[in-house]
């Protein structure tokens, strides 16, 4: 009976280790996540002025969530899609957002950017 318990524990530990590895090396960032990070930026993207602290915090969160090239390319495509879908987003305001927040996320904010060129 003890061997079964020990074997079961080893198998459980193996499964947990595999799942943690999958979570750590998970897929690239997803558009709903990108949209959530930058939802507070919509007023700025439409009207200009100064982005809110919550907008800049979201931009910082996006930077942290997109450390790899693949993540940045996905985030870029998400941003491009939103910019071309939501009416009233000003491309010039979008391009200025990273500088206004003091955050370089490595993803240009533009409706026309080639996201495949991002490193």
Curated annotation (Swiss-Prot):
Record PROSITE patterns: PLANT_LTP
Task: List the CDD domains.
Answer: nsLTP1
Q: Which GO terms describe its biological process?
A: lipid transport
A Pfam cross-reference name:
Tryp_alpha_amyl
Q: Which residues cross the membrane?
A: none
- What role does it play? Plant non-specific lipid-transfer proteins transfer phospholipids as well as galactolipids across membranes. May play a role in wax or cutin deposition in the cell walls of expanding epidermal cells and certain secretory tissues.
**Organism superkingdom:** Eukaryota
UniProt record similarity statement: Belongs to the plant LTP family.
- Detail the disulphide connectivity of this chain as listed in its UniProt entry: 31-78, 41-55, 56-101, 76-115
Give the molecular function GO annotations. lipid binding
Could you confirm whether the keyword Glycoprotein appears in this record?
no
Q: Which UniProt keywords apply?
A: Disulfide bond, Lipid-binding, Signal, Transport
Instruction: Specify the protein name.
Output: Non-specific lipid-transfer protein 11
Q: Which residues form the signal peptide?
A: 1-28
């Amino acid at each position: 009976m003890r061997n079964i318990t020990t074997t079961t524990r080893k198998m459980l530990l193996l499964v947990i280790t595999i799942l943690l590895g999958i979570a750590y090396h998970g897929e690239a960032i997803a558009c709903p996540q990108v949209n959530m990070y930058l939802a507070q930026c919509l007023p700025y993207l439409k009207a200009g002025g100064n982005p809110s602290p919550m907008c800049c915090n979201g931009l910082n969160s996006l930077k942290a969530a997109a450390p790899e090239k693949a993540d940045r390319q996905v985030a870029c495509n998400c941003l491009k899609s939103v910019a071309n879908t939501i009416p009233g987003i000003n491309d010039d305001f979008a391009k200025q957002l990273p500088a206004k927040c003091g955050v370089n996320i490595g993803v240009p904010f533009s409706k026309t950017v080639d996201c495949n060129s991002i490193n």
